[in-house]
């Protein structure tokens, strides 16, 4: 009884500290153990010689980890063959069994746990006896006994763990059947492999798409290419020039931007006349670009009259009308300002 109490105390000592190196939740593990098996209370009926109580023990086990604190194990234990010798009787006793236990653990550090196992073992015990005169008898017995164990477990890697454990099993056998009813203490070192411990690859959020780039471009077209002198109707050559311009505007995606068409005249004529002519010419360009596909709410016309001449005073001394008209040709122009959105395309990383 005293030895049983000590074994239980060792098993429950695992809960006096803090810790965990248990496998991940809801995963399986399997392992093996090897150690020192010692039988207790081994008095054989009619035995008159020494009994070799210390033997080699071994086992294999598998388990399921529910969470960091609770798991279940099933295992096979070979508790060793214990010979005894005497003047009148000699023989051997051996025991083995299958156990099922609940494993209760508590983490001390990230890599180290203490634990206890509580459950039962279905065992088989066999004896062989030789008596004077050469007679030999063999007997066996089966039964169920409680199992108590306590130990520490250290995770070498997430998959590989080692354990040091002391296990106690009560009353393995029936003295009336096989001549003895020993207890067993097994001090063992074990190693286990844990399945499903690999960390899932981190999900890398895709980089946000770069903000669309707003571009502003200016185009200047000579009015003499677009219109006849003093007229606001587009010439065929002017339509061709606007067709080429439209292909460039499309690349800027004016649907997401705006287009402003500015009409300019030279200084020949009155201010009012030139203002009206510049407005008509700008509107003619707008109407044509709308017909090509630019939304009407994204484009506007503005007449600038004879303001902002580009010739400056270079034509001040030119007197003949025809020569003056030629000299002032750069002032007769249509300027187009486009603000458009262009998507920024990033190349994927290799």
From Swiss-Prot:
This protein's GO CC annotations: cell outer membrane; pore complex
Region (4 X 2 AA tandem repeats of A-P): 205-212
TM segment ranges: 27-37, 55-66, 70-78, 96-107, 112-120, 146-155, 160-167, 186-194
Annotated CDD domains: OmpA_C-like
Protein topology in the membrane: Multi-pass membrane protein
Gene Ontology annotations of biological process type: monoatomic ion transmembrane transport
SUPFAM superfamilies to which the protein is assigned, alphabetical: OMPA-like, OmpA-like
Disulfide cysteine pairs (residue numbers): 315-327
Subcellular location: Cell outer membrane
Family, similarity comment: Belongs to the outer membrane OOP (TC 1.B.6) superfamily. OmpA family.
Function recorded in the entry: With TolR probably plays a role in maintaining the position of the peptidoglycan cell wall in the periplasm. Acts as a porin with low permeability that allows slow penetration of small solutes; an internal gate slows down solute passage.
Name of the protein in its database record: Outer membrane protein A
Native species: Salmonella typhi
Encoding gene, per UniProt annotation: ompA
């Amino acid at each position: 009884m005293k030895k049983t109490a000590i074994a239980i105390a060792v098993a429950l000592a695992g809960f006096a500290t803090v810790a965990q190196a248990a496998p991940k939740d809801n995963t399986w593990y399997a392992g093996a153990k090897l150690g020192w098996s010692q039988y207790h209370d081994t008095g054989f009926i009619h035995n008159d010689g020494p009994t070799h109580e210390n033997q080699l023990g071994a086992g294999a086990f598998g388990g399921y980890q529910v969470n960091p604190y609770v798991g279940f194990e099933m295992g096979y234990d070979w508790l060793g063959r214990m010979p005894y010798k005497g003047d009148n009787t000699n023989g051997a006793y051996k025991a083995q069994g299958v156990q099922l236990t609940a494993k209760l653990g508590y983490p001390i550090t990230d890599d180290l746990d203490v634990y206890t196992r509580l459950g039962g073992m279905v065992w088989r015990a066999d004896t062989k006896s030789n008596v004077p005169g050469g007679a030999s008898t063999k007997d066996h017995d089966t039964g169920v006994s409680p199992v108590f164990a306590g130990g520490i477990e250290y995770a070498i890697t997430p998959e590989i763990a080692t354990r040091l454990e002391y296990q106690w099993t009560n009353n393995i056998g029936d003295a009336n059947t096989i001549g003895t009813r020993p207890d067993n203490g097994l001090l063992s070192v074990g190693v286990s492999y844990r399945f499903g411990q690999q960390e899932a690859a981190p999900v890398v959020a895709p980089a946000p798409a770069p903000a669309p780039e707003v571009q502003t471009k200016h185009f200047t077209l000579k009015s003499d290419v677009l219109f006849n002198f003093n007229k606001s109707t587009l010439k065929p050559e002017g339509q061709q020039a606007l067709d080429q311009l439209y292909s460039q505007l499309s690349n800027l995606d004016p649907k997401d931007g705006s287009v402003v068409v500015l009409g300019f005249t030279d200084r020949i004529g009155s201010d009012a006349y030139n203002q009206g002519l510049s407005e008509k010419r700008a509107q003619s360009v707008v109407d044509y670009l709308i017909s090509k596909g630019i939304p009407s709410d994204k484009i506007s016309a503005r007449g600038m009259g004879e303001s902002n001449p580009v010739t400056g005073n270079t034509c001040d001394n030119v007197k003949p009308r025809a020569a003056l008209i030629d000299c002032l040709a750069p002032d007769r122009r249509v300027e187009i300002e486009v603000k458009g959105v262009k998507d920024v395309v990033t190349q994927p990383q290799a």
